[in-house]
């Protein structure tokens, strides 16, 4: 078990990588509030059934509000819109990262929405199988 690093973590996109992160947080960081955001009701229902998150929502801004760490784990094509929606609610000192496979588009699409006081750390975890979803 690791030391609790974050009070609230928002996972925007809860497919293969997002749900893997939720599982690790649930196992290793008890007491961290995990917020899962997805477009599809059936995805959020699976998250709730598997107890991967404490809070579920369809709204990226609702997920990101008050989070210490925000992880974007959606298709790259959604980044600009997600950035536009979450930018105004990111709290001072929050860390914003992603799991996208390329960085030029990530930086281009998210940087305009990251204000001073928010730490933007583009990321790329290596994980996966031929399956998707939680």
Region annotations inferred by a language model:
Residues 2-59, 64-65:
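NAD(P)+-binding Rossmann beta1-loop-alpha1 motif at the extreme N-terminus of oxidoreductases
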Residues 31-32, 90-94, 116-118:
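A short helix->loop->beta-strand "cap" motif at the edges of active sites that frequently abuts
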Residues 35, 96-97, 121:
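Structural detector of well-ordered beta-strand residues that form the stable sheet scaffold
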Residues 39-40, 74, 99:
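Short beta->alpha hinge that forms the Motif I/post-I loop of the SAM-binding pocket
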Residues 42-43, 78, 103-106:
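Conserved short alpha-helix immediately C-terminal to the canonical SAM/SAH-binding motif I
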Residues 60-95:
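Rossmann-like NAD(P)-binding element
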Residues 75-79, 101-102, 126:
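Short glycine-rich anion-binding loops that position phosphate/pyrophosphate groups of nucleotides
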Residues 110-134:
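Rossmann-fold dinucleotide-binding core
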């Amino acid at each position: 078990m690791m030391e609790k690093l974050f009070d609230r973590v928002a996972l925007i996109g809860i497919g293969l990588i997002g749900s893997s992160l939720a599982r690790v947080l649930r196992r290793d960081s008890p007491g961290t509030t995990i917020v899962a955001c997805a477009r599809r009701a059936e995805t959020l229902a699976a998250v709730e059934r598997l107890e991967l998150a404490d809070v579920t929502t369809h709204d990226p801004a609702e997920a990101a509000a008050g989070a210490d760490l925000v992880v974007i784990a959606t298709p790259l094509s959604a980044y600009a819109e997600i950035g536009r929606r979450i930018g105004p609610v990111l709290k001072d000192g929050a860390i914003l990262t992603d799991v996208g496979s390329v960085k030029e588009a990530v930086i281009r699409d998210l940087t305009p929405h990251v204000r001073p006081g928010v730490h933007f750390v583009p990321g790329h975890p290596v994980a996966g199988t031929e399956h998707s979803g939680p």
